[in-house]
């Protein structure tokens, strides 16, 4: 618990912490009002049963004299009306306090989820080479939701603890012995419950986290591979694997729900047994009945508030243990940010200028090996690309063709060497975004939004900022404009998830149009046509070759016909990039 509070103090910003302090103050006021309501209820019950009891209560007698009423009966009626008003005010205040608490929790829950998404997006490309997509999805959604469930449990725990403390203090004034006895029994029982159930709840929370990720993973894999799943007739296998994870997830949730009910049953049993045992003791020792009625009337009224509070306190302690793994996951993911490391959390904007390149792009002295591997993909390699030239890069599978592109794009960080645009280091502060602004990238598998053709070409551009004329210009360059004009909905045609309603060639042409939309000087094709048939590839390359001389073209290819019109061809092998054809 202490560790959670320490991390929470660092995780929340100043505004959030100030809001929490305000909520705690409201909780204390609410606790006082609840205790006052219990106290008034006991006093009113005594006055209604015996109006003469006013004389035995200094507070009641003082109120009676101030009001100046004619009889105790009239006074009791007025007091009952006041009791109703007190409970109305108390409950209205509690409603407002709960509303503010829930508003704080759920508003900041989404903000933290957005913060997590930003945190993941600013991570380097190398992180995603080994990342589990299901874990990333869970971290941004489920982990954050459960983290705020923990914060809500902590706030409610504090609120109920303050109420319990106030009510116990009131009971102590009425019957010190009984209150101490009850408090000792409850504290021992709560300590025992916490000691036994906390490890069980923590394990259930960890299992929930792991199995929830697996459920995400199997759903994602099933949908992404639906064609192969159906052709191979393996539907049952995927359902079975999903069921296995589901069984573990259900078991974890069941354990949490079941063991969360145990404290309530134990506490109610212990409280009733303690009170009845104390009554037996009083009867056996000959305590007058009227004294017993006063004491137990007070305790019974207090129990209406205290028992639910104590039950909730135990549930909240168990919930804290259950949600702790989720909270720690969020905290760990935001650790760099929390530690105040120099991290740029902002993103590229339309205002960013392009890094102009007039003469050449160079990779100098590049050494690179993928994480957790020893084999060097590049060993002090050099590569030069003249501006305006069409440059092909070939090599065997695994030689490092696509790695060249990833290093040029700044996605991979070499252990030695630099990337220069006209002698300007593109990774120097302030240069990298400008460098990317001047590059159009066409991969083998075009990433498609489940949206319209318009949104896929003007990728990531807000609707109100899309340049309609530019859209049609690049579609014409990609030789896709005539096809779109034949569609009933034109640019507003939905392409389906992963562009399933389009052919492979049409998807690639959308990729070309997208790469050209921002009018970059450099166009990179990373095996962009290798998955297409020969005729479609020839048509796509015709569109690309029309840009020869107007753009600097960097073409990664398997097939020689793809690069037959390139001015320079590099072959990547043995950790180097060697010119196979053409001259610099």
Name these PLM-found stretches.
Residues 21-89, 172-180, 184, 289-293:
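Transmembrane helix-loop-helix hairpins at lipid-water interfaces of multipass membrane proteins
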Residues 129-134, 207-255, 322, 327-331, ...:
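Loop segments that connect adjacent transmembrane helices in multi-pass transporters
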